[in-house]
Amino acid sequence: MVAVVRSLMVLLLAQVLLEGATGLIPEVGRRRYSESGKQSPQQSEGFLNEFELRLLNMFGLKRRPTPSKQAVVPQYMVDLYRMHSANGDHSAKRPKSMGRHAERAASKANTIRSFHHEESMEALARLKGKTTQQFYFNLTSIPKEELITSAELRIYRDQVMGAASTNNSSTNSSTSDKAHAGGFHRINIYEIFGVPQGREPLARLLDTRLVQDSLTRWESFDVSSAVFQWTSGKGHNHGFMIEVLHPEEGEVEQERADKHSRHVRVSRSLHQDRDSWPQARPLLVTYGHDGRGDSVLHTREKRQAALRKQRRKHQHKASCKRHALYVDFSDVGWNEWIVAPPGYHAFYCQGECPFPLADHLNSTNHAIVQTLVNSVNSNIPRACCVPTDLSPISLLYLDEYEKVILKNYQDMVVEGCGCR
C-alpha cells in the first residue's frame, strides 16, 4: 500500500507542477486516490520513473540525489532558508551568523550554493609571524546558464585563549598578557592566479579584515570578482590563499604563534575537531541567478494580501475556486535529499464556470465570449477553471554532488483561480 501511495503522490505532484492542468484533479487536501484503473506494476514503474526524471530535470538535477549520512548541511544555509521563510514578517530578526552582505546578495539571486574546500589541497609552508593556507573549491557543478552575482568566503575564528576583553583581565596578569588581551590581528584573502614550480603562489589581494582576538564569530570576505572570473571562463580556478598575520612583531614564541594559528579555523587539527570541524570549516557561498523568476528574498506580501481578499468573497459551492492540496516530500522519499521544507501547500483549482460568468470568477474577455457561445452551441466547451496566479517556493536541498543549495522555484503554489 505504501508503494501505491508513493506512486500516486508522484503522479499528483507531476500533474500539479508539469501539466499545469490542476483543474483536472478531482481530490481535496490529502484525500487519497482510488486504486481503480491503475496500470500494471511494470507499466507504473516505468511511468513513475519517467515522471520523476522530468521533475528532477525541472529542479536542474540529472538524477535523484542519494546523499550519504555523513553529508553536512552548513548552519549558514539553514539560516538563509529561515530568513527567506520569515520574509514579509517584519518582527523576524536576521540571524547573528549573517551580515547585511548576505541579505543584499540574496535579494539579487534565485540560487544560493555552498561549497566546502578540498582538504588535500590546503597545506602551504608556514612563514615566521604568519600562517598561510591554500584552499581549492570545486565549482564545476554550477550550471553555465547561472550568472554569479556575488560570492563570500566565510571563515570561523575562536577566541584566543587568554585574550578576553580588557575589562575582564585579571589585575594579577603580566604586562605582556594585558597588552595581548583584546588584541587584533589581520586576515588577508588572496586569489591564486599562478603556481610556479618550487616558488610561492602568485596571488592578488581580494579582501582583508582586522579582527579582535577576544571574539568568537564567523568572518565574511568578498570574493565575488574571483568566482565570477572562474565561473564565466575568464580565469582558471587555482583557489584562494588565506593569510593570518599575527600581532606580535619581531621574535615570537612558537607556542604563542601556534595559538594564533588555531584561532582562525582554516584546517582540521589532528585527532581533534571530529564533531566541531564539519560546522566550522571554511565555506564558500555563491549567489547566482539563472534568469528564471524572482530572487530568494522576493516579497510575497502583495499576493498574500490579494489571496486573503479573495477568501473573503462569497462564492457558490460548485463554482471555480482554490482547494487544499498538501505535497509531503516524505511520501515520495524525497525527504532524503530535501532538507527543508518537509512539504508545502500546492493547492489546486476546481469548479464550474457557468454562464453567465460572475465577476468573482476572475475571467478573461475570451473566457466570457467562449462561455457565451457554449450557451448556444454545446460543441464549444465551457471555459476551464485554472490557476490564474502562481507563486514560488524555496527549497533547501542536497544535489547529486552533495552540495547544499537554496533555490527559488517558480509557479509552485496556486494563489488564485479563475475561468479561462
UniProtKB/Swiss-Prot annotation:
Residue pairs linked by disulfide bridges in the UniProt entry: 320-385, 349-417, 353-419
Q: Does the keyword Aminoacyl-tRNA synthetase apply?
A: no
One example of the protein's molecular function in GO is: growth factor activity
**Per its UniProt record, what SMART domains does this chain match?**
TGFB
* Signal sequence extent: 1-23
> Propeptide at which positions?
24-303
Query: Among the record's GO biological process terms, what is one?
Result: locus ceruleus development
Q: In which compartments does the protein localize?
A: Secreted
Any one GO CC term of the record: extracellular space
Q: Which residues are glycosylated?
A: 138, 167-168, 172, 362
Is Magnesium a UniProt keyword of this protein? no
Q: Which UniProt keywords apply?
A: Chondrogenesis, Cleavage on pair of basic residues, Cytokine, Developmental protein, Differentiation, Disulfide bond, Glycoprotein, Growth factor, Osteogenesis, Secreted, Signal
- Family per UniProt? Belongs to the TGF-beta family.
The record's section on PANTHER family has: BONE MORPHOGENETIC PROTEIN 2, TGF-BETA FAMILY
Subunit info here reads: Homodimer; disulfide-linked.
So what does this one do?
Answer: Induces cartilage and bone formation.
Protein name in UniProt? Bone morphogenetic protein 2
What species is this protein from? Answer: Tetraodon nigroviridis
Q: Which gene encodes it?
A: bmp2
